[in-house]
Amino acid sequence: MNIKYIILGLLLFVVASATAKYTCECNFSHGETRLIAVKDKSHCMERCNSIIQEVYTIPCDLQTCTCKCTNGTIFGCQPTPTTTSTTSASTTTGKASSSGPSTTGRASSSGPSTTGRASSSGPSTTGRASSSGPSSTGKASSSGPSSTGKASSSGPSSTGKTSSSSTQTSGSQTSGSQTSGSQTSGSQSGQQTGSQSGSQSGQQTSSQSGSQSGQQSGSQSGTQTSGQTSGQTGAQTGQSTASSGSSGSSGSSGSSGSSGGSSGSGGSSGSGGGSGSGSGMAVKVDKCYGTYCPCNKELLSVRVL
């Protein structure tokens, strides 16, 4: 009978030992005490040290807006901006729209001419020759056949480059091209110095016979008034208003031959507008709220209960 009680007691002890748990007390510097249950006493320190990794918070000091942890660490409570703003704005961005048959107004030539007189019409803004139709890139075009050797042209040119699709050879104008700064046998050039006979130049200082100067100081209305260094034998009957001392001209003529007036048109138009209005007000208030600062725990002692 006693043996049975002994065996039963041993069994209960084994079961109790297997299921037994120890209680550990962890004390921290900030005053926190935590009780944890472990199966082995040696686990108390390990478990308490794991709690150190946890962060605790303390409220901010509203006067200094700082927090001082128990281990001496000081955290600042940053002011939280409160912004109230109302903004209304409407804006339209003007995108330019273009219309027109051509924006680069390149010239094509047609029509005979028998006597080399050049007439011009139309304004030229910078003294560079212009021809028919608005040209946005300064390429000139002229229009209309020329019957008595008078080449007619009209239209503004913004950059003063003139284009001609004809080259005059021995008094007859055939196909050719204009090159800037050089003249090929009675053709039209953008800038040249020399004499011309029955041709048009964008810029010249020399005598002309039946030709018109694209850039000359003064204005031309039938005759040339000033800025020309030599006489002209061909009558200039152009109507051209020149700003900055230059006149616009286009068209070329051939002496005892045929020259083609060039025709071409180009135009572009664009419009754009933008408007925007906005009103807003913002109020910024800096306050130190009673939030909490994070602090690190510091373990003081561990005890097994």
UniProtKB/Swiss-Prot annotation:
Its main location: secreted. It is found in: Secreted. GO terms for cellular component: extracellular region. Residues 80-256 have a biased composition (Low complexity). The keyword Amino-acid biosynthesis does not apply. Glycans are attached at residues 27, 71. Residues 1-20 form the signal peptide. Residues 257-279 have a biased composition (Gly residues). Keywords: Glycoprotein, Secreted, Signal. The keyword Transport does not apply. This is Uncharacterized protein DDB_G0284671. It comes from Dictyostelium discoideum (Social amoeba).
